[in-house]
Amino acid sequence: MILDLMRQVGGLAQGATAEVAVTTHHDRELAEKWCARTGNTLVRADVDEAGAGALVVRRGHLPDPTEILGADRLPGVRLWLYTNFHCNLSCDYCCVSSSPQAARRELGAQRIGRIVGEAARWGVRELFLTGGEPFLLPDIGAIISACAETLPTTVLTNGMVFTGRARRALESLPREGLALQISLDSATPELHNSHRGSGTWEKAVAGILLALSLGFRVRVAATVADPGPGELAAFHAFLDDVGIVRDDQLVRPIALEGVASEGLALRRESLVPEVTVTADGVYWHPVAAIDERALVSRTIEPLTPALDAVSRLFAEQWARAAEAVALFPCA
């Protein structure tokens, strides 16, 4: 067994893998010990009940995901909550098909409170509330305030409904431990309005300026398929002038999800998970929160089993990945 390992793994380039045949559980134990002693990695064991089959062994250690992704992007650090799915807009690339006609599918304040408490105890360190448009909910102020009291919270919004009850809810929110992420796709109205509707750019900019004037930390996120020459530079320059720091300026691609007719095709295996809870279940990532292929569990409470499952599945995915997993930054 040891000779087979030396012969098949010893000549590999760093990071390459080889299959090594085994006939018993004892062979696997020997391989595990050899890998531990030699600095190699047993990636996977495809064996039957008797221990016969093949081991996949990697030359060298797996890269530490913390070093590659950063500690703040490891699975389980972030938790996304879809507060609702109905929206005042019908964006033509919405990854979860939100619109004024969409079913509301609200999580509800009490359930959100229970989920957030459990998540904090599990080890989640940051919350993201999204929709739909969260500020359409009559109790959104109480929901956001309770979340921000427990963990640092970011609320994704189109920034267009800050009038009346929603304006009062906005003004009541804490400034510490809370950020508002407002959608704006371009430095001028044409591109933004072509996807989100006539007049939406002006209203989104007004929402950004209002939130800044009220003392909130504001992030701005653009969703852009194929930016033309100079478009991104103009976008960043516009936000610089508005007063949004560069770390709070995000540009992300369109995903081929929801109502989008084009965009980046994603697979669960190619995404670093960011656990996402909706009224329908727990999903692998917020960009795929209505995609059955990304469903982790229909059981929302307790949340711990789903968090554990995602962590375990990602560890397995990381160990056997032949291609790098990719971040899809929603925030």
Kindly label every feature range from the protein language model.
Residues 87, 91, 129, 155, ...:
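Conserved, mostly hydrophobic/aromatic
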Residues 30-39, 168-170, 233-242:
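Short, aromatic/basic amphipathic alpha-helical patches
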Residues 126-127, 150, 154, 178-179, ...:
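Conserved C-terminal portion of the radical SAM core fold
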Residues 101-114, 134-174, 184-189, 199-203, ...:
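Canonical radical SAM enzyme core domain
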Residues 1-78, 82, 108-110, 114-118, ...:
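Domain-level signature for proteins that mediate thiol-based redox and metal-cofactor handling
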Residues 254-331:
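Accessory C-terminal segments flanking Radical SAM cores
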Residues 67-131, 135-149:
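Conserved alpha-helical substructure of the radical SAM core
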Residues 83, 131, 157-159, 182-186, ...:
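A cross-domain feature marking catalytic cores of carbohydrate-active enzymes
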